């Protein structure tokens, strides 16, 4: 209460005491007089207090006052009762807390400065503390998001338990799916490895058949790959054919529509009575194909260094015996030179002497540059048109051959 209002109240009380108190009375009369005076004083003070309150309400806005809106002890009592009622509602509602409902100014000293107001505030604090202890989902950290707290987002233990059960079930399903996928991958890998091994075995079997000039039958090939791999026979046969093309320059073809008998045909179109008829025929055919390709790629003339660099990409090295070709140097510098498929000569004015390879007359007669280009394109899964310079050279070679035949 402002000082001006207090002074007016005190002035009214003193005036009533001065006007209504007779002097010189003692004993029971004085006591009775005092009771009447106190009764009249209290009624007068209440009337005066009402006047002061009305004047203060008219002159001073409630927002600027630091006291209770009513400014009277009754108002303080009513304020404390409303707090207790609000506290009861807080206990029933677990979603509120004392920090969210009580302003900081109401904690501590009473707005009116009276002991009753202070007691009412302390009672509210005690009730609020009890409510906080009873409510498991509310605390003074109401502003903290649930994600930052360790509790479940729903605020109940059952929700956390159900979530953990779901996670365990999901993990079990994931493990089962992962194990199933791993088994499928392993089975597929084993199948590929088995097909690859059986293809190599079948290629060696066909090589021996060809060298012995024996007929190649499907029944014999099925016996070679065994009965348990019969479902994979088409894949094994396809991989075997690819292996024969890369290694020996020949492809596996059916002799009739029944598909029961096969034969090996040169990929370069070389006649069977030529290089494929002598000893060590397939290794020679394979190295000849690689040698003609590298010569054509290097402008129809390749140095010995360029040839060995290309053969090194195929795992064929100078001075090292190969598991399929044996002595590769002897084949390309002696055997194929004697058969006139390649020319091996010293580079002019080279010191120390260097050597180069060219196509021989028999290679020009039995194959064409276009066939060699197609072999190169097939090995890289492309088309001859992707090598424009080589393709142009091959077309010119085709035209010249046609003109020679007409002449």
From Swiss-Prot:
Residues 1-175 are annotated as: Disordered. Residues 18-29, 57-71, 94-113, 136-155 have a biased composition (Polar residues). One of its GO terms (biological process) is negative regulation of transcription by RNA polymerase II. It comes from the Eukaryota. GO terms for cellular component: nucleus. Expressed in testis. Not expressed in other normal tissues, but is expressed in tumors of different histological origins. Residues 195-394 form the MAGE domain. Keywords: Tumor antigen. PANTHER family: MELANOMA-ASSOCIATED ANTIGEN B6 (PTHR11736:SF139), MELANOMA-ASSOCIATED ANTIGEN MAGE ANTIGEN (PTHR11736). This is Melanoma-associated antigen B6. It comes from Homo sapiens.
């Amino acid at each position: 209460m402002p000082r001006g209002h207090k002074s007016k109240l005190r002035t009214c009380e003193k005036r009533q005491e001065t006007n209504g108190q007779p002097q010189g009375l003692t004993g029971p009369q004085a006591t009775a007089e005092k009771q009447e005076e106190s009764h009249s004083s209290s009624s007068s003070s209440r009337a005066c207090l009402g006047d002061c309150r009305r004047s203060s309400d008219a002159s001073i806005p409630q927002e600027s006052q630091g006291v209770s809106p009513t400014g009277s002890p009754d108002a303080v009592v009513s304020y404390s009762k409303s707090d207790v009622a609000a506290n009861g509602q807080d206990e029933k509602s677990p979603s509120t807390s004392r920090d969210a409902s009580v302003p900081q100014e109401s904690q501590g000293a009473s707005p009116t400065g009276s002991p009753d107001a202070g007691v009412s505030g302390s009672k509210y604090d005690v009730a609020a503390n009890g409510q906080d202890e009873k409510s498991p989902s509310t605390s003074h950290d109401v502003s903290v998001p649930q994600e930052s707290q360790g509790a479940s987002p729903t605020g109940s233990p059952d929700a956390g338990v159900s979530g953990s059960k779901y996670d365990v079930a999901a993990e079990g399903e994931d493990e089962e799916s992962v194990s199933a996928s791993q088994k499928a991958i392993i089975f597929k890998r084993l199948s590929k490895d088995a097909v690859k091994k059986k293809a190599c075995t079948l290629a060696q079997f066909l090589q021996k058949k060809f060298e012995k000039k024996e007929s190649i039958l499907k029944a014999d090939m099925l016996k070679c790959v065994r009965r348990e791999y019969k479902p994979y026979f088409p894949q094994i046969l396809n991989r075997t054919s690819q292996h024969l093309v890369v290694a020996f320059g020949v492809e596996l073809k059916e002799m009739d529509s029944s598909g029961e008998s096969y034969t090996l045909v040169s990929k370069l179109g070389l006649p069977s009575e030529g290089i494929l008829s002598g000893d060590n025929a397939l290794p020679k055919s394979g190295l000849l194909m690689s040698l003609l390709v590298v010569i054509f790629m290097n402008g129809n003339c390749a140095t010995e260094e360029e040839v060995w660099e290309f053969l090194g990409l195929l795992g064929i090295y100078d001075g090292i015996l190969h598991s399929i070709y044996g002595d590769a140097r002897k084949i390309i510098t002696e055997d194929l030179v004697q058969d006139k498929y390649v020319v091996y000569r010293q580079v002019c004015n080279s010191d120390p002497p260097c050597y180069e390879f060219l196509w021989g007359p028999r290679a020009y007669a039995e194959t064409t540059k276009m066939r060699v280009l197609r072999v190169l394109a097939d090995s890289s899964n492309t088309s001859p048109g992707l090598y424009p310079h080589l393709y142009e050279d091959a077309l010119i070679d085709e035209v010249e051959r046609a003109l020679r035949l007409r002449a």
